[in-house]
Structure formats: C-alpha cells, structure tokens
Amino acid sequence: MPQQSILLDRSHQVTTRRRQTLSDLVQHTHHPSPGVRKDAVMGMLELVKTYAGFLELHCAALINAALPLLGDDDVHVRGAVATYFGVLLDRLDDEAFAPFAPSMLLLTTSAMSHISMAVRIDALRVLSLLLDKVPALATEDWESALDAHSGSDRHGQRLLQAFFAMLGVAADAHRQRLG
C-alpha cells in the first residue's frame, strides 16, 4: 500500500532502530494502545541519545509530544515518560527549558490531582525533577497555598495545594483555621 511506512524513503532522515522518524513517534503518542505510546516515548529518547544536537533542534516537538502523557492511565507509559523527562531535563540548559516549564508544571499539577493514586504518585517523580530543574518557578508563592483569601494562582501555590490534597491536609488545615 502506498501509505505504508515501509515503502517510504527515509535514507536522509533521522530514524530509530525501527526506522521511525520523530513525526511517526509523535503520532504514536496518541495511539490507543499503551504499549505503542510507551514505545513512542522510548523511541524519542533513543533519538535524543543517539543523535547529537537532536534535542536542541527539535526541543518543542520532543517536549510537547510527551507532556500529555504525564497523566496517562498506564503505569509503563508514565514510567517511560518520567525516565524520558529525566534525561531531557539533564541535557537541556535552563534557558532552553524555560518556555516549557509552565506547561510541564501545570500538567504535573493536573496529574497530582488525578483520580488514580498511582498516577498521583508517579507525578511526584516528575515533580522531583522539576524541583531540581526550576526550583524558583516551582515554588513561587507556595507560602499562600492554604490562604483562602489569596488571589494568587502561581505554580508553587497550585503544586502545594495538589500535594496537600494528596495527603488530605488542605481541608483539615483550613477547618482548623476557621474554627
């Protein structure tokens, strides 16, 4: 069939051992099968590790493709994503990562409030990476997290509120303050 990838000439493209391009892998991050999503993340990691300068050249696509998978329902996909972001954050300088930090913090916060406890716990792994990479942004305005009258909506405040919610602390602290 003409649309089959085996017939495409990829001799001048960067590919994985399975002859998948970044475009193929990005598409596979949306696949219904968790195994395919995990393989897509690991394929993107392979491209980053194999080709010098690939991360810098395709930073936006590499980060944005995996961000929605932070809250994936499959444990293996989340594990691959945490490993993937661990490598990416180690290799990216702060300036290159800065445009993506707010989105990653927001999606990490979202994963921390997921209905599944396993997703919430895995989000803490990513939070740890973010606290190492962008500590000032991640903790910005954290001290007002339990203040019901605070109009602030900073990353630190949201992260701490999500963390307290995971522990069941926020409601108790608020009730004690009221009365």
Question: What does each model-found stretch correspond to?
Answer:
Residues 15, 65-71, 106-114, 130-136, ...:
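Amphipathic alpha-helical segments within extended alpha-helical solenoids and repeat-rich scaffolds
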Residues 24-36, 65-80, 95, 107-119:
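Short coil/turn segments at helix-helix junctions and helix-capping linkers
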Residues 1-45:
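N-terminal "cap/leader" segments of large eukaryotic alpha-helical scaffolds
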Residues 7-18, 48-59, 89-101, 129-156, ...:
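Flexible loop/turn segments at the boundaries of HEAT repeats in alpha-solenoid HEAT proteins
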Residues 43-47, 84-88, 127:
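Hydrophobic core/packing positions within alpha-helical solenoid repeats
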Residues 38-42, 60, 79, 121:
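Alpha-solenoid HEAT/ARM repeat scaffold
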Residues 117-132:
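Internal, conserved structured core segments that host functional sites
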Residues 40, 81-85, 123, 178-179:
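Conserved hydrophobic register position within alpha-solenoid helical repeats
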